[in-house]
Amino acid sequence: MKSFYHYLLKYRHPKPKDSISEFANQAYEDHSFPKTSTDYHEISSYLELNADYLHTMATFDEAWDQYESEVHGR
């Protein structure tokens, strides 16, 4: 199963055009990001406590919904 982090990396872009691309770039630079996790609560807790680069959790929620839809077919 593909982790959320590995899914998110497909949105990396040298000149981010949206908040998810910006999030992907920053997560890539975050060496403590839970790279193998597929658990919403683990990742959201990490982001709330450690990711000052994420301006709003709505960006994570949008990316998570896309991850669930594309990877898990939900």
Swiss-Prot record:
Gene3D superfamilies named in the record: YozE SAM-like
Family: Belongs to the UPF0346 family.
Protein name: UPF0346 protein YozE
Organism: Bacillus subtilis (strain 168)
Lineage summary: Bacteria, Bacillati, Bacillota, Bacilli, Bacillales
Gene name, Swiss-Prot/TrEMBL: yozE
